Every structure is written in C-alpha cells, then in structure tokens.
Amino acid sequence: PRARIEAIAKENGIDIAGLPIVETPHSEASAEKAVALVREGKAEALMKGSLHTDELMAAVVRRETGLRTSRRVSHCFVMDVPSYEHTLIVTDAAVNIAPTMEDKVHIIQNAIDLAHALRFPEVRVAILSAMETVNPKVPSTIEAAALCKMADRGQITGAIVDGPLALDNAISLESKAIKKIASPVAGRANVLVV
C-alpha cells in the first residue's frame, strides 16, 4: 500500500517523490503487474520483495503474458559482501533444485547476462564443487569440467569460466595460493554457480 511505502521511505530518509507507486488489490495482482511492466519496457528488473515465490513465478512463466525466453528460468542472489572486493552473484540456489547439464548452461548464461547488465567490468564464473580437481567419483566435478570446455568452445559466452573450484579457493586469493591453483577465476570469482 502507498501509505506504508511512503512511511518506510520517510523513516529511512529516502526521497521517493519522483518514483511511481503502482497500487494493486492483492499480491497475485502485484506479480502480474510487475511482470507486465517488465514486458512493456517500463521496468528493467523484478524484485520479489515480500511476495511468495510461487506467486511471482506463476506470473513470470505464464505462456501468454509472462517473461519466458528460450532459456530456463533461474535465480540469482546479488550480494555486496563488505569483506570481499567484488559484488557477488550466486546462482541458482532457489529455483532449480536438481538442474540437468543443459539447465546449468542456461543458469550460467543467465548469470553472465545479469553480470553484464549490472556492468561488471569482467565476469569471472566459478563452478563450485566439493573440490577443485576433477574426480571421476564426484559427478559435479565432471560436469564443471564439461561446462568449462563448453565455454572454451563458445557454447557459454561473455565470461571467463573455471571449475571445479571449492568455495574457499573461488573467493580467496590466499586459498588459491596455498593450493597452488593456476586460474584467472580462482580467488577473484564474481559469479558462483552452486
């Protein structure tokens, strides 16, 4: 509701006088209207806010009025971690629970495209696993290696992609050095694929 939005803005010293507030009768209508605004080019991004995920996603994936593309829908957390020098995108920890290899290609490309939209100067994707070496007994390491080869061959574009990497050596230069990992992504990743 307008009054609540205005009160929160005032309480936090935020001037929203020049911003449009779109009122709707209920949460499902809010999701539908938000998706329509993006489709019409009047909004550039969707923010879930307090909507339930299923309400928002129902509007997003609706065939006639949603935001479907040729790729699978995926989720990205965009985080500003004060102790890390780069903004981080973490994908996909919310929508695709057990993605296939094809799904992972879409998830990675979606995150890369988001990073470019957010004007990351260089996109460095770390495909995470429990370890940073390829192990035939650990399927996620094999998939990570295959995804990197797909990036090498232009099937995933717009970023430097490396994996498998463990979380510590994906974001810590110290861990990268200790484990002697030669990688342009290790220790400097700004997209983490979980």
Over which residues does each language-model region extend?
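Anion-binding alpha/beta catalytic cores of soluble intermediary-metabolism enzymes, centered on
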Residues: P1-V194
